[in-house]
């Protein structure tokens, strides 16, 4: 042991000097990239400010937003595990990022370490004509016919879960129940059934739910890709989820080859793919695309992720906002009652939802004032001139804030006012550039009509079937990142039957 120490000891000063040199280079690199922008003067070696981000993300992002608003530049900077990050408050600059998603500018990544977590077969990483073609092929998944099919499926699942919630609440009427996990489970059940319908059996669903929970937890943890760490568990879980969905793709493809009626999203998708392939064959053309089942499974996982967490967030905030605005709640109930009554025993149809204009305005206002996914991370593939006096360095992770944009432009943006989206005011059109919660540019949410319909359906049924009251405590409505935003108390409410159904 002494001999080993004797061999190493002469090198220790050089090793320490080398580490000190690396630390110095890191600080110089950060300062050079930061320039005149608001942000930390110096950063913690190697880790940067990842610990504050993980331990209190709400405080971290609130500070970045405040720094971005503190100057006329409209953006601020920080440093996370070797990555220089730039937070954008300005709506105009956010649009500049969204409009320049291409190989030599910005790459959408979905998460600061998204490519490692989500895998290669992912819609968000695509560019150009290939991306346009895929979105075109996805479009038939959201036609009125498809949305009508989904509404029937969603309604059955929603009622099942509402009954379960009410049964739980009736066991202890004076104790509030937290809805976040209940909403998550309901939306996961809904998403699975709408997207892959009969192709997931009971055992597959159980495994799917466990793996999706691994994924969700890993999104909020340090990106340590080692055995036993949440990030590694999440990465491996995504692989298993995609494999499961790939099997569903194959089963759906076989069903659609037999010209059976579509019963879920993947059926509509495979039906359209087969139509395009057959049309090319008739015209003597080559097969128009080459998607493997694995690739399609990856794209399906994108849909699931987008639908699941955003829908849960939106529903929780709907309950919070409707509880605190009883006059809006009454107008929602009146709007729903004009077209549907739970006592009628008739289903609430997609056509009925189309007629509920005030309900749609409420859904859009909820998404505006509490954008579920508050930021849309991109990475700069090359240097990019964002303003006249600042060039974003290559490799920078850029966070355009769609949440901040919702509070720019609109009159009294802090006020929950669904009337702003009614025909008389048309603020959705007047301030269209500020309404970014559903995205913008080539990667705008391809399923936004489905997302709005889903939220409208749940609100309509929840308000018609259930009486609810928030359990108010200090800070209960503060924002918590999980990774989409939710009320800090997990939305604790008292629930009771409103009708006999």
Curated annotation (Swiss-Prot):
Family: Belongs to the cytochrome P450 family.
Cofactor(s) for this UniProt protein: heme
Subcellular location, record wording: Membrane
Enzyme class: oxidoreductase
Keyword Transmembrane helix: yes
Keyword Metal-binding set for record: yes
A Pfam match: p450
Ligand binding (heme): 445
Cellular component annotations (GO), alphabetically ordered: membrane
Protein name: Cytochrome P450 710A11
Pathway where it operates: Steroid biosynthesis; sterol biosynthesis
């Amino acid at each position: 042991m002494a001999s080993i120490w004797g061999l190493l000891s002469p090198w220790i000063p050089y090793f320490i000097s080398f580490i000190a040199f690396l630390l110095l280079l890191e600080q110089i690199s950060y300062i050079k990239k930061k320039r005149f922008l608001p942000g930390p003067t110096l950063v913690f070696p190697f880790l940067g400010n990842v610990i504050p981000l993980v331990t209190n993300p709400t405080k971290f992002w609130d500070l970045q937003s405040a720094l971005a608003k503190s100057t006329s530049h409209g953006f601020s900077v920080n440093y996370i595990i070797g990555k220089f990050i730039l937070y954008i408050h300005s709506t105009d600059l956010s649009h500049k990022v969204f409009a320049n998603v291409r190989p030599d500018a910005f790459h959408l990544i979905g998460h600061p370490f998204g490519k490692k977590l989500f895998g290669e077969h992912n819609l968000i990483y695509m560019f150009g004509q290939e991306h346009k073609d895929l979105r075109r092929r996805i479009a038939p998944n959201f036609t009125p016919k498809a949305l009508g099919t989904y509404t029937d499926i969603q309604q059955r699942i929603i009622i099942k879960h509402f009954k379960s919630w009410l049964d739980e609440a009736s066991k202890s009427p004076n104790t509030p129940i937290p809805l976040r996990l209940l909403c998550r489970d309901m939306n996961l059940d809904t998403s699975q059934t709408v997207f892959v319908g009969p192709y997931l059996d009971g055992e597959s669903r159980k495994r799917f739910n466990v793996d999706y929970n691994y994924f969700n937890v890993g999104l909020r943890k340090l990106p340590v890709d080692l055995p036993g760490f949440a990030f590694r568990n999440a990465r491996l879980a995504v692989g298993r989820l995609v494999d499961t969905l790939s099997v569903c793709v194959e089963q759906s493809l076989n069903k659609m080859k037999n010209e059976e009626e579509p019963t879920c999203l993947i059926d509509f998708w495979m039906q359209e793919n087969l139509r395009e392939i057959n049309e090319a064959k008739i015209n003597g053309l080559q097969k128009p695309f080459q998607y493997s089942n694995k690739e399609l499974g990856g794209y399906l996982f994108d849909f699931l992720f987008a639908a699941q967490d955003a829908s849960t967030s939106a529903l929780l905030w709907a309950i919070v906002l409707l509880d605190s605005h009883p006059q809006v709640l009454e107008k929602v109930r009146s709007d729903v009652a004009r077209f549907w009554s739970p006592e009628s025993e008739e289903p609430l149809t997609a056509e009925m939802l189309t007629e509920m204009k005030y309900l749609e305005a409420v859904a859009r206002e909820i998404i505006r004032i509490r954008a579920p996914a508050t930021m849309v991370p991109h990475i700069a593939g090359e240097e990019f001139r964002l303003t006249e006096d600042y060039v974003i360095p290559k490799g920078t992770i850029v966070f355009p804030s769609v949440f901040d944009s919702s509070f720019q432009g609109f009159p009294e943006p802090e006020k929950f006012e669904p009337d702003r989206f009614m025909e008389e005011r048309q603020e959705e059109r007047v301030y269209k550039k500020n309404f970014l919660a559903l995205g913008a540019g080539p990667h705008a949410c391809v399923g936004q009509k489905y997302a709005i319909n889903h939220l409208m359906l749940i609100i309509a049924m929840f308000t018609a079937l259930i009486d609810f009251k928030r359990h108010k405590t200090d800070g209960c409505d503060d924002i918590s990142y999980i990774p989409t935003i939710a009320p800090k108390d997990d939305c604790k409410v008292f629930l009771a039957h409103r009708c006999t159904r």
